């Protein structure tokens, strides 16, 4: 079953004197429920631009992004719902940590979803467990964590929203071989246990 797809997706960036330059043009792609998909390409080829369209952070100049057959840019309500259903973790997500504790950082997304405190707590603890963060980690400042732990805490923040689609933009960038294997292993486990699509 197709969970997320694009139809003739095109996005232009203004390039000063040169005018508009196509970052992505007429992209048609389908992502099926429960699959893991990798998107590869050279630096500047539009990978991150495409990913940012998939949860509505960028709006296409033409074309559509469909989540379970519905255009995510149809209206504000649909777009807001899509951002919770399609979780996006940016490249170097550890630079987005900002709360005073890891627990509060992971709970940020679920709180914004309007969930009650018991459900928020359940999601935070489940996401922390997925990424291998202990109760002691949850009490710490995110700035006291190692680089790999910060990365896992940031990914847990997206996982805590329990998205149908989890998008990770270069999740292993800048990590050593052991750190890369840890991240890839947790992504595989997450997909196996939740049935989510992972891009």
Roles of regions detected by a PLM:
Residues 55:
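Helix-to-loop junction immediately C-terminal to a conserved catalytic motif
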Residues 63-74, 82:
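Conserved ABC transporter NBD signature motif
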Residues 118-136:
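Conserved ABC ATPase "signature" region
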Residues 166-169:
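Catalytic Walker B motif of ABC-type/P-loop ATPase nucleotide-binding domains
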């Amino acid at each position: 079953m197709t969970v997320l797809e694009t139809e003739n997706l095109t996005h232009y960036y203004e390039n000063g004197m040169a005018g508009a330059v196509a970052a992505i043009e007429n992209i048609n792609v389908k992502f099926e429920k429960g699959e893991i998909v990798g998107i590869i390409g050279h630096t500047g080829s539009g990978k991150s631009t495409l990913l940012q369209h998939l949860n509505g952070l960028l709006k296409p100049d033409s074309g559509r992004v469909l989540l379970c057959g519905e255009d995510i840019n149809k209206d504000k309500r649909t777009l807001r719902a899509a951002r919770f259903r399609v979780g996006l973790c940016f490249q170097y997500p550890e630079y987005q940590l900002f709360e005073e504790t890891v627990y509060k950082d992971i709970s940020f997304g679920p709180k914004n979803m309007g969930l009650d405190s018991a459900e928020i707590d359940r999601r935070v603890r489940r996401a922390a467990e997925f990424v291998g963060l202990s109760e002691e980690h949850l009490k710490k400042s995110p700035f006291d964590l190692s680089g790999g732990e910060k990365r896992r805490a940031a990914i847990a923040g997206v996982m805590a929203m329990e998205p149908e689609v989890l998008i990770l933009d270069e999740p292993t960038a800048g990590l050593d071989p052991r750190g890369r294997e840890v991240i890839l292993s947790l992504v595989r486990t997450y997909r196996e246990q939740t049935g989510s699509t992972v891009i």
